[in-house]
Amino acid sequence: MLNYIAMYPNQYEGLMNPDIILGKQDTPIEDFIIMAMKELEAIDNIKIENIEIVRDQDEVDINRHMINVNYKKKNIDEIEIPKYKYIADSRYGEIIFTIRVTTNLNEKVITKRILYPIEYNGFYYNNGKRMKAIWQLVDGSTYAQRGKNTLKSRMPIIIYQNRKRIITDINDMKYIVTSYSYALNGKSKKPGAKAKVKFINPVMIYSAKMGYHNTIEFFGMQDIVSIETKVKKDEDLYYYFPLNDMYIKVLKDKFEKYDLVRAFVCMTYNLNSADFPVTPKNIDDRDYWTCRIGTVGTAKNKNLSTFREKGITTIFMIERLLDATTIQNLRLPMYYKSNIYYLIYWMMISFDELRTKSNIDMANKRIRKNEYIVNSSLGKKINENINRLIEKRGKSRLNSMDTLLELFNFGSDIIVSGMRNLNDLIKTDDIVNDNDFILDLAYSSKGPNSLGDGNNKKIATKYRYLHPSMAGILDLNTSSNSDIGLSGSFTPFAKLYDGYYFTPDHEPCQGRYRFEKDLADEGFRKIHGNNFDEYLKYLEKHDKFKELLKYEAIKIVEKET
């Protein structure tokens, strides 16, 4: 009888999901490293000319990664490489980047090597230790908090909604409408202090890129909202709201029917400024709006132009928010994630749908492994270095080749060293038998970009609770001894979609289409396409704003002596 048990049909055998056990669909770690390094090409002075991947560990000279290379030195080739033979068993590959750094006065070609761990039978051998990387359970895209939605990216992208903003028309009638604000996290002046948040009017951001009238069209408000210098005799059809010495003119029926129209009018109304009024001359002046952005959260000054550099730096910071990894993972049409400006617009028009998401529903979660190994160390360091360069850019004495070369002054073993600090996610192997199958299914909600930002006391109790969506995905019999509900094990039957999501449903993104379709049904405007897919193809093909919303060039120009 025992000889035939293996032949007995098992009804659950076909339900086993090898992808979650073996992780074969995970993006290779080399791809994440290349994506992280390519972020440096956001700076016009830097161009990666060649990439060589060395997967054979016998061809990797570990001694090259045991020294700190200062790229500001003139003769890097003269640095002496030690010749040691290490006893510790480690399995590493390396990626060799050939990078050309140029300025208006100088040029230099450097070689940057990045050491990375090679997985062998599900384990890493790092500095003589056998390590196992487990899954990290993170938010799939956005998560909702009181009055705001946050998209997890390189840095959080935060949109606030205020449903009780009061605006007053020229007849002193008050309206309670919805408005949106973009929140940019600033630096705290004191170590450990809470960072200050800048609340910026989104219409101001778009106007700084392409002027106000192009912003009207980008939001789909053409023929609905306009700016007038005087009130016309058509108040039976239009509402008029003051905008300094001008007026916001909006169709009454559309204002009363559509929340998108009311929100746009409110954001425009909030552009009023007693110190730096909006005029017909400056309403489409990008430089004016850039300076206005620079005034947010700063001390008052009667000279608007003094805020220009601050405004440019803020725009650079906004354009640094969205990284290639987020674009790859986000389940949206490319139109809405092609750059940060389209993404902020999507977050506003889809705010209510995103707000209804449950933060503990597994449908709003995904898992990752190679991503956090790279981005928690290399990705984070590159981001910090670029932000530091942006802040230095306005100081002419720091605009030099040395400032650019400082971007590369980090250890080539930054990834393998960083792995040793990810104790919640990368476990040192202490299994005394060959039953390591359970480790392949282990997960943790802790780690980089996780709940509580590394402080478990900040995590609300509700995030430790069970949710109906966890049935069939999480092993309800397994949990952490010290942090209940924050780590455990998946079942081998959990289904995965689009890589590592738990639902086939993509992000809601039809808010603008529904708005345009309603206008078409009223006979007010023609819609292009018979369905959402056709409408989206038309937008992508006839996108006049793509060039207007392209990122500003980050460029270092050396001062001639």
Over which residues does each language-model region extend?
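Canonical SH2 domain fold
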Residues: A133-W135, D475, G485-S489
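Active-site-proximal "nucleotidyltransferase
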Residues: I431-A460
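Flexible, glycine/threonine-enriched loop-and-boundary segments that flank and lead into catalytic domains
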Residues: N106-K112, S450-D475
